């Protein structure tokens, strides 16, 4: 049986005064692409990243260092408000570094920050559509009949009503927590497969896109923990005639967003077509199970683009084509991407001409 939170028992303790002390929850990406966190007591409130101390953790327990040299360092990168503790308490997204000062192998933010700094005059904006699937503690899709299947896809996308959507309370809690924390969440919707949902984050400029998506993920898995529900970011969590889960990446630069920008959108698509294999390599593990040419995807081995075509690698929204400027949507990234790697390679390809 899964452990259930006792929010009623916890509530009176969270209401106690902290005095002048503040709790800072340091959050980082582990060696397997998951999320970890631990808490530090601070002596005063801060909103300045420079006032936060560098911390460390046991990297041998997170697949980030050997046991004989296990210290990995946490360097604060972004601050968010803490929706779990409230008050002046904060969440600190941190980068991981080895003891020699080099970025840990899972620290993709470090490289992408350099890329975004080089491309800052282009003002790259991103909006990511994070799909995910909910599972019961026993590993069955949340809300599905035990030992069976729900009806075929059709009524679930943006659905309303019993039997069409599952765990809306969890999703609403996550939405509000993101807004409170300062995550630039822009929307939510139920997805095509039952118990699959999506939230959107953005527009965010440059490196902040990865920061905000990772923190939104952290909030989601923490809240799901309270519900006793598991969150899967696998791109094809269930075999068969069910949609996979992606992280569609909407992208533009300053010139694309201005009148006449369609020319630059077309140029970006041409550049992306020439590095399809390099992009697929960082667009998520097991993405071949999702990019089959079915279920609103293009085939992983082919590059394609089109207006309003959800079966293409790159989709240009119809309103963008009609007005002649705006953005493109890269539909290839899987739900389990590292957003730093994806946003970084898109800018490298389209702005820095790698």
Curated annotation (Swiss-Prot):
Homooctamer. PROSITE patterns: GLNA_1, GLNA_ATP, GS_BETA_GRASP, GS_CATALYTIC. It is found in: Cytoplasm. GO terms for biological process: glutamine biosynthetic process. Keywords: ATP-binding, Cytoplasm, Ligase, Nucleotide-binding. It is an enzyme of class 6 (ligase). Belongs to the glutamine synthetase family. It holds the Pfam family Gln-synt_N. It catalyses: L-glutamate + NH4(+) + ATP = L-glutamine + ADP + phosphate + H(+). This is Glutamine synthetase. Residues 22-101 form the GS beta-grasp domain. GO terms for molecular function: ATP binding; glutamine synthetase activity. Signal peptide: none annotated. One of its GO terms (cellular component) is cytoplasm. Its main location: cytoplasm. The keyword Nucleotide-binding applies. Its EC number is 6.3.1.2. Disulfide bonds: none annotated. Residues 108-354 form the GS catalytic domain.
């Amino acid at each position: 049986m899964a452990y259930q939170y006792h929010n009623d028992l916890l509530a009176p303790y969270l209401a106690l005064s902290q005095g002048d002390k503040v709790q800072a929850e340091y959050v980082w990406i582990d060696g397997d692409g998951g999320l970890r966190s631990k808490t530090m007591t601070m002596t005063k409130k801060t909103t300045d990243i420079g006032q936060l101390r560098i911390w460390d953790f046991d990297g041998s327990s997170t697949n980030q260092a050997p046991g004989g040299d296990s210290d990995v360092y946490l360097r604060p990168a972004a601050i968010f408000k803490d929706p779990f503790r409230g008050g002046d308490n904060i969440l600190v997204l941190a980068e991981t570094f080895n003891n020699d000062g080099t970025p840990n192998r899972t620290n993709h933010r470090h490289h992408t920050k350099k890329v975004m700094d080089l491309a800052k005059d282009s003002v790259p904006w991103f909006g990511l559509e994070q799909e995910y699937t909910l599972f019961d503690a026993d590993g069955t899709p949340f809300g599905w009949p035990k030992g069976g299947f729900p009806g075929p896809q059709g009524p679930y996308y943006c659905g309303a009503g019993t039997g069409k959507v599952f765990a809306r309370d969890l999703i609403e809690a996550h939405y509000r927590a993101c807004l409170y924390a300062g995550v630039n969440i822009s929307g939510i919707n139920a997805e095509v497969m039952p118990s699959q949902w999506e939230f959107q984050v953005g527009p965010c400029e440059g490196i902040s896109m990865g920061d905000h998506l990772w923190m939104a993920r952290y909030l989601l898995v923490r809240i799901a923990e309270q519900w006793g529900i598991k969150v899967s970011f696998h791109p094809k969590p269930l075999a068969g005639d069910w949609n996979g889960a992606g992280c569609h990446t909407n992208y533009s630069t300053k010139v694309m967003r201005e009148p006449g920008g369609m020319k630059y959108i077309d140029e970006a698509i041409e550049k992306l077509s020439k590095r399809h294999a390099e992009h697929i390599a960082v667009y998520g593990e097991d993405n071949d199970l999702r990019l089959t040419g079915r279920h609103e995807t293009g085939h992983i081995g082919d590059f394609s683009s089109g207006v309003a075509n959800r079966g293409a690698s790159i989709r240009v929204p119809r309103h963008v084509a009609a007005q002649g400027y705006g953005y493109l949507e890269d539909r290839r990234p899987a739900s389990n991407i590292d957003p730093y790697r994806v946003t970084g390679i898109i800018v490298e390809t389209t702005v820095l001409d790698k």
